[in-house]
Amino acid sequence: MTAQCARTKKAEGIKPGDICLSLLLFFCLSLMLRRADVATEYMRQGLRLCAHAVLPSLFPFMVISELLVATGAGEWILAPLARPLGKLLGLSKTSASAVILGLLCGFPIGARCAILSYKSGKTDKTECERAVACSAIPSAAFLISTVGATFWEDKKFGVLLYISAILSALLSGILLYGLKKRRKSEPSRPTQTTPAKIHFDAKMFPTAIRNATKNTLLICAYVTFFATLSGTIGIVFESLAANKTTHALLSSLLEISGGTSAAARLPNKQFAKILTGAAVGWSGLSVHCQMLSLCDEQDISLRPYLVAKLIQTAACAAIIGLLK
């Protein structure tokens, strides 16, 4: 009995990973307190980014996507494209429509639509997880206008980044479908198989506004925090005379905007473009946290999403490396 209690206490003890995470959090807190002026300035930059880019490019689409799913209009309008895409990825027309919206409008539109469809009983949990995994890419506006035209001063490169993001997302969806077919299918919640119908209700619009506001503000909070963290860490790297490549790699790991901006300033342009492609595929911890906040409410696993992101990172980098 004593030995069993000892083993239980040992199992319940502090794990090495918990210690590392605690030290990392304390380091980040100390860093922001020591360079509060820098942290404040980068927080302002993050808020400006939200006001000038995130809110205009995200909030209207969030409202419309909520309405498209709630009314059933999205599935009806996108049906001609959803059928072949659904066969390719092994998804229903409902989930395929969510993926299309995600590829057109960028994250988290597709993920939000997939989760709403699962919540309403139109899809099962496994299908929702795969739809979330292959629909979360940066928007065309961000890649073409911000990364291509602003950071690289080359809109064509922005278009190439967007195409590579779509292709890598589809590749990850195909591979996840292949993995699913190899495994034994688990019992899933029954889904609705009735044809898509369009239904409008007076309550749908205020509900869509409320949900879109909540999710958009949450995303802005993540963008602001990671912009502050990434900028403050970048100042430390500069004071230590660290390599610009190291700074660009770390920025790409944390947040896509700062990562692609830092990559564009690297002297080796071929490597810089490949790193930009990888940053687009990975999308940054900031986006992953945003996806976690969306999925956690419905107990959706992020494992397929993270696997897909690793595939997309490699695929985007490879496509850019081959074509540029």
Question: Which residues does each predicted region cover?
Answer:
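Alpha-helical membrane segments and immediately flanking helix-loop junctions
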Residues: L88-W152, L250-P267, F271-C295
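Membrane-core helix-loop-helix motifs of multi-pass transport proteins
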Residues: S117-L179, S293-A318
